[in-house]
Swiss-Prot record:
<keyword id="KW-0732">Signal</keyword>
<keyword id="KW-0800">Toxin</keyword>
<protein>
    <recommendedName>
        <fullName>U-myrmeciitoxin(01)-Mg4a</fullName>
    </recommendedName>
</protein>
<keyword id="KW-1015">Disulfide bond</keyword>
<dbReference type="GO" id="GO:0005576">
    <property type="term" value="C:extracellular region"/>
</dbReference>
<comment type="subunit">
    <text>Homodimer; disulfide-linked.</text>
</comment>
<dbReference type="GO" id="GO:0090729">
    <property type="term" value="F:toxin activity"/>
</dbReference>
<comment type="similarity">
    <text>Belongs to the ant myrmeciitoxin-01 family.</text>
</comment>
<feature type="signal peptide">
    <location>
        <begin position="1"/>
        <end position="25"/>
    </location>
</feature>
<keyword id="KW-0964">Secreted</keyword>
Amino acid sequence: MGKVFFFVLMIAIIGSTFLIEEALGSLVGCPRPDFLPSWNRCKSCVCKNNKLKCPKILKGSLLKTAA
């Protein structure tokens, strides 16, 4: 019972951190500053309307760049 509660608590903490970071990101705009956690910054980001857009990486294009 305690393990399940701890697991749910961790998910809630991670989720709330992500929401807080989203709010911070929308406040500071684009590009994202380094103090925000790395999961919300991607290496090849495009700014559109002051929002960060991360391109979807397709397996085919990934294979072409590797070859």
